[in-house]
């Protein structure tokens, strides 16, 4: 982990598990991570980017050295080996997919979470990423000795983004765009809290500023992030080079 990234972590008093997670991940990344990914067919683009460099002189919070890698195939390229492993696990009965199952509550018995309950939504063949039907056609309950909630963030729910906006940053923007579909709505965060989970760092969000509206949107307020090349040159509308530190893609 780079020097300034270490400074930028700024763990809070209640960050016990985030700190443990960070330590475990750094150990993994410095050890078996590359060989493990490569053995599954993962490859990276042979140019290391320098994003979040902490200002133009690499002395602020951020990466003091280039360390940003782009996967060959971008998002689908990183998902493919894990999807393959998941489908192999499904074939031998170690994993079950329950698509179109919406969790509405966590099941608690004698103070212990032991399952989930919710609604079965009608089948929908709409294009991936578009808003699908919410029509309920049934219900379900699933039980397990351990329950892990991994439901994503709140980027598709601008009301929730504004509700959790850090006071130190003033008023949230009036106009926002979304880099994620509408179903990334943070709904399970509230459901999990209602079941007794302790939430921390609600105000810690990561929103990129170098985004534009998708001219051919798939989901509501669809935004596209601009991913520039390493140390690219940027100019204003009159052809003058942007002064430091106004370099998109370098410190956000």
What positions do the PLM features span?
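Polyanionic/metal-chelating signatures
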Residues: 1, 34, 239
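Glycine-rich active-site loop/strand segments that organize a redox cofactor
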Residues: 1-26, 40
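Conserved redox-cofactor binding core of oxidoreductases
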Residues: 22-140, 144, 158-161, 212-213
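Hydrophobic alpha-helical scaffolding
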Residues: 23, 68-73, 175-182, 221, ...
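Glycine-rich loop(s) and the adjacent beta-strand/alpha-helix scaffold that form part
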Residues: 123-216
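An anion/pyrophosphate-binding glycine-rich loop and adjacent beta-alpha core
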Residues: 189-191, 195-252
